[in-house]
Curated annotation (Swiss-Prot):
UniProt keyword annotation of Electron transport present: no
Family annotation (Pfam families): SmpB (PF01668)
A GO cellular component annotation in the UniProt record: cytosol
GO BP term, pick one: trans-translation
Summary of the function given for this chain in its UniProt record: Required for rescue of stalled ribosomes mediated by trans-translation. Binds to transfer-messenger RNA (tmRNA), required for stable association of tmRNA with ribosomes. tmRNA and SmpB together mimic tRNA shape, replacing the anticodon stem-loop with SmpB. tmRNA is encoded by the ssrA gene; the 2 termini fold to resemble tRNA(Ala) and it encodes a 'tag peptide', a short internal open reading frame. During trans-translation Ala-aminoacylated tmRNA acts like a tRNA, entering the A-site of stalled ribosomes, displacing the stalled mRNA.
Protein name, UniProt field: SsrA-binding protein
Protein family per UniProt: Belongs to the SmpB family.
Listed Gene3D superfamilies: 2.40.280.10
GO molecular function, one term: RNA binding
Record localization: Cytoplasm
Keyword annotations: Cytoplasm, RNA-binding
Length: 155
């Protein structure tokens, strides 16, 4: 019996939500070779420095490290190669228009399997300033303290 791996994240870019303000997300397919998908299924993928660009009406994902498959020998490809993302034409046009603005980037947030296919959750993001990051952390900690106090009060 096959395990249900529906939308189970294989890799997440946790630092992205800290460093960027994400205002829109897109689900994209990713073109991988046979040994790459085997490595992805083993969760040997890092999204930390990844980003995407639109070139000639196609979206290309760069700087995403997929470790070589151990039993792949000659079929393994370069770990940091540029990979094509599969999106609709309307989505690509929208992304291209947004990326032409200043300070906007297109980053990978999560990789997961959906119906046996590898999907990448991509986000249009704007970089946060240091004071925004501190404010977010402060707000998070305050919410945690309030939740802790409510829990202690209800005991």
């Amino acid at each position: 019996m096959v395990k249900n791996t529906e939308d189970k994240p294989l890799a997440q870019n946790k630092k992205a939500r800290h460093d960027y303000e994400i205002y829109e997300t897109f689900e994209a397919g990713i073109v991988l070779t046979g040994t790459e998908i085997k490595s992805v299924r083993q969760a040997k993928i890092q999204l930390k420095d990844g980003f995407a660009r639109v070139r000639n009406g196609e979206v290309w994902l760069s700087n995403v490290h997929i470790a070589p498959f151990e039993q792949g020998n000659i079929f393994n490809v370069e770990e940091l190669r540029t990979r094509k993302l599969l999106l609709n034409k309307k989505e690509i046009a929208k992304i291209d228009k947004e990326l032409s603005g200043t300070g906007i980037t297109f980053i990978p947030l999560k990789v997961y399997l959906k119906n046996g296919f590898a999907k990448v959750l991509m986000g249009l993001a704007r970089g946060k300033k240091d004071y925004d990051k501190r404010e977010t952390l402060k707000r998070k900690e305050q919410n945690r303290d309030i939740a802790r106090q409510i829990k202690a009060y209800n005991r």
